[in-house]
Amino acid sequence: MEWKLLLIVLPWLLVCKIFYKVEDFTEPDVAYQSIDYHPEDYIDSFTDFQKHDYFQY
């Protein structure tokens, strides 16, 4: 029974390993380089804490 499960799961793991890289899902690619992420457009609505975090005083 366990070997059947392995035969089903292993090929998918190999496919995922080959076609998908960890870099594809990291924060810089997903958030900071996305079309909708432009903090400077919303800088007037930032709280003091967010400004501190954004400008790294």
From Swiss-Prot:
Subcellular location: Secreted
Signal peptide: 1-16
Assigned keywords, A-Z: Secreted, Signal
Domain of life where this protein originates: Eukaryota
Broad class of the protein's primary localization: secreted
Single GO cellular component term: extracellular region
Protein name as catalogued: Protein new-glue 4
